Regions:
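Anionic-ligand binding patches
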Residues: 2-5, 11-28, 32-33, 37-220
Length: 220
């Protein structure tokens, strides 16, 4: 039974979200109760906002009202310090075509070709939102999460998606590294999925959203 719709057609994002929410919400079977927008023909919502939060809410609202289901959405991206926050909300289409990870990585690495390690600071950002349709009470919530890191000079690893192969999390490196430095010098595409999902920007945003989602499901 569909209880929650993820306002996205990105299968990588759906897999990641299911793992983030697994066993965190009473009465929710993430494998059967959480589906993506494409599986129930929900609309593909243009990202016309100018912030992650605006885009996230646009998608959640549209899907909630069109399907009558509780909808969750996120807008995520990479913010590079030396590029003054770019690619930001344009991360998924940085190279011109939405969702072309290889082209986006190639373009960004080219733009940073001459930037030394000490100036390659960046962070993953995520605004996660919940929209409950009018028939079920009609309310919204937005939460935010970040993962700071350093950008590598070349992709590393086959896991994850998006900019994961070039992002090395700060928290897994240095003198105070989590997990005793076992994952130092690894990109988000190399570290185990369960480790990534414990520190990622998306995990932090959606975990903050969990109480609102639990409340919505209890009153459904």
């Amino acid at each position: 039974m569909v209880k929650v719709v993820l306002a996205s057609r990105n299968q990588g994002k759906l897999r990641e979200l299911r793992e983030i929410l697994r066993n965190r919400i009473f009465g929710l079977n993430v494998d059967t109760d959480v589906v993506d927008a494409a599986s129930i023909n929900a609309p593909d919502v243009p990202e016309t906002g100018v912030t992650f939060a605006e885009n996230s809410l646009l998608k959640a609202r549209a899907v909630a009202e069109s399907t009558g289901c509780i909808a969750i959405a996120d807008d995520s991206g990479l913010s590079v310090e030396v590029l003054h926050g770019a690619p930001g909300i344009f991360s998924a289409r940085w190279a011109g075509e939405h969702g072309d990870d290889t082209a986006n990585l190639t373009l960004l690495l080219g733009q940073l070709r001459d930037i030394s390690d000490e100036h390659r600071a960046a962070k993953f950002c995520c605004a996660a939102s919940l929209a409950v349709p009018s028939a079920l009470g009609g309310y919204e919530a937005v939460e935010y999460g970040e993962l700071p890191g350093t950008l590598l000079h070349a992709p590393q690893g086959d896991g994850g998606f998006g900019y994961d192969p070039i992002m090395m999390p700060v928290e897994l490196n240095g003198d105070n590294a989590l997990y005793d430095g076992a994952y130092a010098d690894q990109s988000c595409a190399q570290i185990p999925t369960e480790i990534k999902n414990s520190i990622s920007h998306r995990a932090r945003a959606f975990e903050a959203l969990v109480p609102y989602l639990q409340q919505a499901l209890e009153h459904k």
